[in-house]
Amino acid sequence: MFDPLHSGSVSVNAGSDNRTFSSVVLDRIEDSAADSLVFGNLGIRYYKHFYFAAAVKRELLNGLELSVGTKYHRRSIVGHRTEEAVDARLKDVYRQLAPHVSIVWQPRMYYYVKEGRKVNIGSRMPRLSLDVEQGVGRLFASDGIYTRAEADVQYSLQMGGDARLYLRAGGGGFFHTDDVYFADYAFLRENNLPVERSDELGGVFQLLDSEWYNAAKKYFRLHATYESPFFVVQRLFPKARLVENERLYANVLIMSHLTPYSELGYGIGTPYVDAGFFVSAKNLKFHSVGYKITVSLFGD
């Protein structure tokens, strides 16, 4: 860490990510009829993803944070090539060098200073995040040129008493694409939990098939979670003290062939377990039902 009064830091990380597929598959998706689209029939070849990232982060103003760095992606095809399954344009290995800029702004941030270090507490204002990555082609054997731009807004609104409404909205896409690229988003991810949350079930999709996270050139998403300690259970069973909160969930995703994908859910929260039941619809038609449970070993 440097310049602790402005939360300065340098980060370096590397690792492997989920398997993904190339933009060639996105073209096949757009050419397919929405009602008959089956990922297993698209001849998808997946790529293993290794990445290296380095960034410098600093708070420019109170609540305004800037991160600048670069990312290196190496994607190698899984298994052996078969001409029936793989488009002739595809290579076995793709390398992509991409400068990266991220901005996070949350106005009226409350903070305190301890031992010369600024510690942010929180804000009652919305949190806005912007994330841009620029693929640089033909530099250090890098493949393809693209611009990925995304925005994410989160807001926690006190509704009176102990009730609270959590909102999240965002969107993004790939622009100025040249040749093959990989639609790997920063915010549209299975594990991208919101900062403004009270549990790990709201603000993300619970029943969405994993292939869809990389299946869009552009997307828009909207999430809402309403939380209250006095909703159904406490009214019907006043002595059910273990249930601290009840939650209603609504999630919407709009992208190619999903117009829209939606989820509705109901959940309960206890000191040790959060559980939710969800129903999903694809293009206004019933799709699936399911449930999710998260466990906290030590409670709050």
Predicted regions span which residues?
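Active/binding-pocket-proximal capping segment
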Residues: 169-173, 186-188, 240-247, 268
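Outer-membrane beta-barrel transmembrane domain signature
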Residues: 29-33, 97, 164, 225, ...
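C-terminal outer-membrane beta-barrel translocator/porin domains of Gram-negative envelope proteins
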Residues: 9-27, 35-44, 116-120, 127-232
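Repeated loop/turn-to-beta-strand initiation elements of outer-membrane beta-barrel proteins
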Residues: 3-8, 62-66, 76, 106-113, ...
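Residues on the lipid-exposed face of transmembrane beta-strands in outer-membrane beta-barrel proteins
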Residues: 1, 14, 54-58, 70, ...
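Residues that define the transmembrane beta-barrel architecture of outer-membrane proteins
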Residues: 46-52, 93-99, 143-149, 216-224, ...
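Transmembrane beta-strand segments of outer-membrane beta-barrel domains in Gram-negative
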Residues: 17, 22-161, 247-249
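Structural signature of outer-membrane beta-barrel domains
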Residues: 15-21, 61-63, 73-77, 106-110, ...
